[in-house]
Amino acid sequence: MNSTLILKGNILYTPRPSEFISIPHGYIIAVDGVVVYCGESIPPAYASCEVTDYSDNLIIPGFVDTHAHAPQYCNRGLGMDKELLPWLETYTFPEEAKFSDPDYARLVYGAFVQDLWRNGTTRSILFGTIHKESTLVLMELLQKAGLSAYVGKVNMDRNSPEFLIEKTQQSLIDTKEWLDASLQFGPLVKPIITPRFVPSCTSELMIGLGKLAEEYNVPIQSHLSENHGEIDWVASLHPESPNYTDVYYEHRLMGQVPTVMAHCIHLSDVEIDRMAETQTMVSHCPYSNVNLSSGIAPIRKLMKRNIPIGLGSDISGGHIVSMAKVLTEAIGLSKMKWVEVDQTYAPLTLSEAFYMATKGGGKFFGKVGSFEKGCDLDALIIDDTSIFDPNERTLEERLERWLYVGDDRHIVERYVAGYIVPNPQG
């Protein structure tokens, strides 16, 4: 028997980057978790169905975080005076080594999943660690919480500390075993192949991971062109390749299956061509790029090439889980790039940044991040009445105000694929 859900409230979403759709006191109808109608009135065929009325609250799509490191959750706000490579050595690698203990993983991942829920991140693309058991713990907790995610067991077999490095063949064996075990988590929580980045993966490992991605038909995530030191390092490790991007491409880690690359700040025009050709998604991580002094990604330039773009918190290079704040930071960074670097590329608009935080990143999951017909119903219910303002505001103004000055306390309900997601901690 089909399950029908009807939500009523002030609806806002972005079917395209340039356009907000706002429907005052409108209706969203979903059947078996998929939107079949979104409009001003209830079609006659559904007139007898029960309506969940959220009154004057805002109804927006759930947020999608396209890049975060779950094991780095306890490192938020630490080492923000360092650049990428020293930061990894000082803070990241020692913390990730602790996840050899599944009990420690359960403790930290439980807090991380709770924070995703609290901030309205209904879908995410996550790095775990090299430890397959702990990565399975993360997947289990996400499944139990009712949140959707791609989760990766990290691979790294070179240029890594002795306490956080794998043997090449064992890394591939562990990854295959982890992929097989991941099947138990169902449609909302899925595996993603995760070479940390080129400097930490030998060619043998990268080739093997590419084969596993194709064999299991699972996507790939990694980092690309985040920091000048990293780029120079890759060039010294792979002089046979014309650029950083093509190292991934030549090892069949880009384009064969859906791929998302975090950062992509310092790409050459040739590399941008490759990204467009392979339709590799960019995860733009504005807080991290500022905190680690990495640079400002040329987002408008990438948009003009029709490269898919989502937003990432990049915990813990980024220090804030809230995608509402990540998207406003993306707008702010684009303004700085426009003012200080290149006035040929206009700053991001609110609708463009909101699109990236919802439908833009949601495309990696399929039809997600919008209330258009055929999309999974992921939604947040926002009660903004406690934000003082005696003036009458449009729905778009109310949304903008909440994104900038509101917080998770205003999110009163969360839906994933048509189901209410209760507080994981009860």
Indicate where each model-derived feature is located.
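Metal-coordinating catalytic core of metallo-dependent amide/deamination hydrolases
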Residues: 133-264
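Alpha-helical scaffold segments that flank or form the walls of functional sites
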Residues: 76-147, 171-185
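Divalent metal-coordination and catalytic microenvironments
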Residues: 10, 28, 33, 56, ...
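Active-site gating loops and adjacent loop-to-helix segments of metal-dependent hydrolytic enzymes
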Residues: 74-105, 153, 158-168, 227-256, ...
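His/Asp/Glu-enriched, well-ordered alpha-helical/loop segment
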Residues: 250-256, 300-388
